[in-house]
Amino acid sequence: GGALVAQGGSTELVHPDQAEVGFAYDGFNRWLLSADYAWIGWARFHQLDIHFSNPALGTVTNIEDYNNSSAIRLGAQYTAHNNWQWRVGFAGVAAAAPPQTVTPILPDQDRSNYTVGLGIPLTTGLTLDAAYAYVWNPGRRGRLANPTSPSISGSTLNDGVYTLFANIISISLKASF
């Protein structure tokens, strides 16, 4: 070890292709139903090269080998007689990172989001929206350290378990004019 020294470096990250399709249907009395599907082309993310400006350090290559991922989202909204809008939703998201690249820096994993919400019209053009989301996943094994040599597979270092639970509360005031 020794003192950390400031140094320059560069990398390039190409964002994945994405395709989404969705629809909403309001043909039922007071109901709006919606659904969408997203595909994200993460399979093109094979490695991340970090080029250091100090020639002695050279380039560090992190192997990623991501998979394509997808998400499905479903929602419903009911407008009551007092024009309050009651909402419920679900989103399921598939992880892109393979087990050998899951780390504390990016503990990517499959997850489910469950939501409820309420829209209250206060005056003409002014609405108060409140929502709650619960994010859950089943947990996922991942590594705590990088392989120390190319002959060590990242998946053999999967000695950590990552879980995620989140409670998200949102309140907003919407003005329409």
Across the structure, where does each feature detected by a protein language model lie?
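Outer-membrane beta-barrel porins/channels
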Residues: G1-F177
